[in-house]
Amino acid sequence: MSALAKGWILYRPEPGLVKQESYEVDRLLEVAPRHGYDLAVVDPDDVQLLVNAEGADAVTVDGEEVPLPDFVIPRLGSMTGYFALAVIRQLEHLGVFCLNGADAVALAQDKLHQLQVLADHGFPVPKTLLVKFPVDADMVEETIGFPVVVKTLVGTQGSGVYLSEDKQGLDDLLQFVQANNPDARLVLQQFLSESRGRDVRILAVGTRIVSAMERIAESGFKSNYSQGGTARPFAWGPKNEFSVAEVMRVLGMDMAG
């Protein structure tokens, strides 16, 4: 019987969470052995970085030297800081396959940069405005219009996303944000009314769609399942396959959703 391929899930539990592992991480750990993989969760903060020209076949994790894994799956989301990206880059330098690599992970963190890259390659994207305080609501109305979506540049599972129906609502929201975090990085985005409370989430590996679902909000405009929405299967076609493959190629991603 051949040995199981060894992999790491780079994951850092968020401080204060009662449930230390996310559902996605738990599921990966559960199903991996059935498919010939031996997975372990590694906190990137526990990895000691040593850069040299000779390479290595082992790294130090939590004070102990361990063999390099065959592959790494970063599952850090908005918690991906400089050190975590450096760990991913170092593992890539040592020949470990990372799904995704450091450049793709960094790009996935920055919503505005993603849109810049996609727009540069001709993909349709909603009008998006990077703002700093104070924000001119009249200018927002002229360039984007209302309602307008307000997003933090870093956020997942629907956090940091708000909908302002009019200028007064936008002013009230931005005044609150400025009072609590004057250095907040925000984008204002065109609201696509046809997608209010629903969207399609496609999961892909390589250039192939492996799963797709339509997400529907119970109330409000956020369709995230983690925000109380529901989900049902979505039947995708060749047009979806082509679009997904092109987006992943442009963004340099091996896995996306």
Question: Can you say where each PLM-predicted feature lies in the sequence?
Answer:
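ATP-binding N-terminal substructure of ATP-dependent carboxylate-amine bond-forming enzymes
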Residues: M1-L99, A104
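Active-site nucleotide/adenylate-binding loops and adjacent lid/helix of ATP-dependent enzymes
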Residues: S2-L29, V66-P67, L91-G95, D103-Q189, ...
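Residue-level detector of anion-binding/catalytic polar loops
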Residues: D38, F97, P124, P147, ...
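Generic beta-strand structural signal
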Residues: N100, L130, A204-V205
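Beta-strand scaffold of nucleotide-dependent catalytic cores
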Residues: V140, Y162, L173-Q175, R198-I216, ...
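A short glycine-rich, hydrophobically flanked beta-strand micro-motif that places a catalytic Asp/Glu
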Residues: L188-Q190, V200, M253-G257
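A long amphipathic alpha-helix within ATP-dependent nucleotide-binding catalytic cores
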Residues: F221-G257
